[in-house]
Each structure stands twice: as structure tokens, then as C-alpha cells.
UniProtKB/Swiss-Prot annotation:
Its cofactor is a divalent metal cation. Keywords: Cytoplasm, Hydrolase. It is an enzyme of class 3 (hydrolase). One of its GO terms (molecular function) is nucleoside triphosphate diphosphatase activity. This is Nucleoside triphosphate pyrophosphatase.
């Protein structure tokens, strides 16, 4: 969705406010040239203050982008586009983020075993055009339903003990072949499950560029 404007888009200073290997990989494979800034946002929001789990995810993505912008401003840098993203796993209206321990990871996978859960990835984009002095933002989230097969306690224990998925929302990474073998079906954007909804991101980047940077 952005291939025809990629050359022009890549003339902008674009920041990815994430050090996630998968987000870095897939944004790069899309052909976008960008720099990486690790946002210092602590991700310590009170979930009970949000009307929905998706609002919580959106706010995390927003604050990641905003904090990255503040960090760059302190270094006298002004990018054109900052992309913040956050992913959560949702089951029974409960949020499964990155587990804090191996035991918590095992508990998460036990709850998800044999069931359909939802992966929500929220994206927040801050933009600034220095030529027109215009700025703004855009936010969205993408949902993908993932169905797990039945996972035995032995399988869960082996996976967690050997692959230690403490950096994965929901305690699994679909890009890891062992974890991919848990998945019976996927309904929605595969890349969304990895942490970056490529299709929806492309649509939003295109709209931001055409509306705010394309010379009329």
C-alpha cells in the first residue's frame, strides 16, 4: 500500500519507538528506512482506569511514541514520523502481557490451551512537517484471533523451560517454530501476531504522507 510512495516517504526522518526484533525486521522488509529509539516509557499504566482492554493497548502505544519524541527533543532532534506500538493477548476480556516469571508463563499457556484468544496490536503515529509547521497524530489497533490446540502440561513445561518466552505477550512467539506448532488456526493478519500489523500500518502511513507531506 506504500510501495508507490516509498522513495518519497523514505526522504522523511522516521523513528520506530521499539527495539522489538520482529517489528524492526518487518518494518525493514516493508522497505521503510527508519531509525530505532528505545522509548523510556515504563509501561506501568493502571488497567482498571480504561473502559476496554483495547483502549489500554492504544494508550501504551501512544505513550511509547510520545516518550520517544521527548527523548529526541532533548537531543535537539525533530523527526517527521514516530511509530509507537504495543501488543497484548486477550482472553475472556483479560489481558495477557509479558509474563514476569516462568511459572506465570506456564499458567498463561495453560489458560490459552484449546481456546481462541485475540492478539491486539495498537499503533500510534506522531507526525511533523517542518516545511508547513503542521503536526498531528493517528492511532489504530488491529485484532487477530488465534486458536490454540490442546497443550499438555509436559509440552508447556518443555517449551517454557527451554525457550523462556518472558519477552512475549501471552508467553509465546509465533515466529518460533515450536510455538507456531501450538496454533490450530489464525483469523486475521499474521503479522499482527508478531507485533506489527503491516497492512493497516501501510494504509495509515500512506494517508499521513498524502495528507501532510505530499506537495499539492
Amino acid at each position: 500500500m506504500i510501495l508507490d510512495i516509498l522513495v518519497k516517504l523514505n526522504k522523511l526522518k522516521i523513528i520506530l519507538a521499539s527495539t522489538s526484533p520482529r517489528r524492526i525486521e518487518y518494518l525493514g522488509k516493508l522497505g521503510v528506512k527508519f531509525e530505532i529509539v528505545e522509548s523510556k516509557f515504563k509501561e506501568d499504566l493502571d488497567k482498571s482506569q480504561f473502559q476496554s482492554v483495547y483502549d489500554y493497548c492504544l494508550e501504551n502505544a501512544k505513550l511509547k511514541a510520545i516518550h520517544a519524541g521527548i527523548q529526541l527533543k532533548e537531543q535537539n532532534q525533530q523527526p517527521n514520523i514516530i511509530i509507537g506500538s504495543d501488543s497484548i493477548v486477550v482472553y475472556d476480556n483479560k489481558i495477557f502481557e509479558k509474563p514476569k516469571s516462568l511459572e506465570e508463563a506456564k499458567s498463561m499457556l495453560t489458560l490459552l490451551s484449546g481456546k481462541i484468544h485475540t492478539v491486539c496490536t495498537a499503533v500510534h503515529i506522531e507526525f511533523f512537517n517542518e516545511n508547513t509547521n503542521s503536526k498531528g497524530s493517528s492511532s489504530f489497533y488491529t485484532l487477530t484471533n488465534v486458536e490454540f490446540d490442546q497443550l499438555s502440561p509436559e509440552l508447556i513445561n518443555y517449551y517454557v523451560d527451554n525457550f523462556k518466552p518472558l519477552d512475549k505477550a501471552g508467553s509465546y512467539g509465533i515466529q518460533q517454530t515450536p510455538a507456531a506448532s501450538f496454533i490450530k488456526s489464525i483469523n486475521g493478519d499474521f503479522y499482527n501476531v508478531t507485533g506489527l500489523p503491516i497492512h493497516d500500518l501501510s494504509i495509515n502511513l500512506r494517508k499521513i504522507y498524502v495528507d501532510n507531506f505530499l506537495e499539492k
